[in-house]
Amino acid sequence: MANATIQQRLVAVRSFYEYLVEDGLREQNPVRRGQAGRGGRRPRQGLVQHIEQAPWIPNEVVWQRILAACGAESLRNRLMVTLAYDGALRRQELVQLDVEDFEPAHCLIHLRAETTKSQRAREVAFGTTSSQLFVAYLRERRTLFGRIDGPLFRSMSNRNCGAPLGASSWSKTVEGIARRAGAARLSTHTFRHLRLTDLARADWTIDQIAQYAGHRDLATTMRYIHLSGRELAARFHRANTTIHADRERLLASLLEDR
């Protein structure tokens, strides 16, 4: 069982024992909480050690398989994939997009505060492929539903055809892509992780990436960036070469007689 699942279940068990203690049915709660260290004291571990695993992002080979699997999807779903990546969008942010949120002339999406996790509006960009899919999907959407404004993504199910698409439908779509691509760890959040990592590869600063992601805390942004060991080593050598050149330039002044 995943560590996160165990932690969630412990919360329920701990709450139950707290109820028993409050009602006088038990003297103490056996499911202890972890505590951060304060005043020089060592932190106290909870009943089960909290293990935070690095989120997964695909390498280039797996990413190619994912894109190949996406090729079999509908126009709507292909647009959702490209926007999820381009804008580093969370699941709820993606499914709650309105047509009016788009500024095609500048390839911008205006994310409304009420649709974001942080409750703060922000702007993200989209690329040429997303732009072309967006125009094609609007054309298809108008033919199918006879409308342009309102929620962008509409259900094509016989049960609720034309209704705004729900988050669970998008999750099921990604699960299907994952099966066909042989990428079991692919999730709706993977596109966000990959995009933010690619921005780091493009030498965006951590502050710029945090703004794009809609993070209040830079520590949160750091958890989203997954540069490989080779990439980090290459950056180190580039930086070291620059520093060494500067040092040599300064040392060269010693060659001059004074």
Region spans (language model):
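N-terminal core-binding DNA-recognition domain of tyrosine recombinases/integrases
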Residues: M1-V48, R142
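Flexible interdomain linker/hinge and immediately adjacent N-terminus
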Residues: L25-R65, S155-A163
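Conserved tyrosine-mediated DNA breakage-rejoining catalytic core shared by Y-recombinases
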Residues: A36, Q92, Q96-R139
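Basic, Lys/Arg- and aromatic-enriched nucleic-acid-binding interface segment
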Residues: P58-R91
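Catalytic-site neighborhood detector that most strongly recognizes the C-terminal catalytic loop/helix
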Residues: T115, A213-R238
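Active-site/catalytic core of tyrosine-dependent DNA strand-transfer enzymes
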Residues: G127-A183
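Short, basic (Lys/Arg/His-rich) helix/loop patches that form interaction surfaces
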Residues: S171-Q211
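C-terminal secondary-structure termini that scaffold catalytic or DNA-interacting sites
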Residues: R238-R258
